[in-house]
């Protein structure tokens, strides 16, 4: 695993759906060497990888993998990227402008994936223009939120309850 701080709760929840206890598996911190650890046989599974990257990296290296998405195995759905502003000093108009720019970029990428890809790789073609990034790009397209400034308070409350129940947090916030 790559240590995230919630691995016991998340992995434990997923394992329980298969009647396996967390303490019945050996957890090995491989840092960020997820793909190479799995490919080398050092570990039998990895946790902490990106949905659009490690799967593709391993496939390109000739390894067939089975993916287990946490939300399909008892872990509440959560947003993987959240922009946070200081509650005391934020600039409301700057945040609105930022969110609008993110939304416009996402809509452009979804509507014009090939043009957006060309613009992306033009930044650093020697390192970005390769098959792994092409596959990751393709898989990322389906994950974009078309309304990035929208907030699902119930989703946040459900994940907060999950973290509180598993003692990741000491107090239960209300979204």
Residue ranges and their predicted role:
Residues 1-2, 26:
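Short, well-ordered beta-strand elements
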Residues 2-13:
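Secondary-structure junction motif
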Residues 12-16, 59, 121, 164:
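Class I S-adenosyl-L-methionine
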Residues 18-22, 62-63, 126-127, 168:
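Short helix-capping segments at alpha-helix termini
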Residues 22-32, 67-68:
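Short beta-strand-to-loop elements that line the ligand-binding cleft
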Residues 33-124:
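Pocket-lining segment of extracytoplasmic ligand-binding domains
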Residues 91-170:
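Secondary-structure end/capping motifs
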């Amino acid at each position: 695993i790559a240590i995230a701080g919630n691995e016991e709760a998340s992995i434990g929840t997923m394992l329980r759906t298969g009647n396996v206890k967390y303490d019945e598996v050996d957890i090995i911190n491989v840092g960020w060497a997820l793909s190479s650890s799995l490919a080398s046989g050092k570990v039998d599974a990895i946790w902490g990888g990106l949905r659009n990257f490690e799967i593709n990296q391993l496939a390109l290296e000739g390894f067939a993998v089975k993916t287990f998405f946490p939300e399909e195995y008892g872990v509440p759905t959560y947003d993987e990227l959240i922009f946070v502003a200081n509650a005391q000093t934020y600039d409301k108009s700057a945040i609105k402008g930022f969110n609008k720019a993110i939304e416009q970029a996402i809509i452009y990428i979804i509507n014009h994936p090939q043009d957006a890809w060309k613009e992306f790789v033009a930044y650093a073609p020697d390192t970005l223009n390769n098959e792994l990034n092409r596959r990751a790009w393709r898989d990322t397209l389906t994950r974009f939120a078309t309304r990035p400034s929208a907030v699902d308070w119930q989703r946040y409350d459900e994940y907060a309850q999950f973290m509180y129940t598993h003692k990741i947090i000491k107090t239960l916030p209300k979204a």
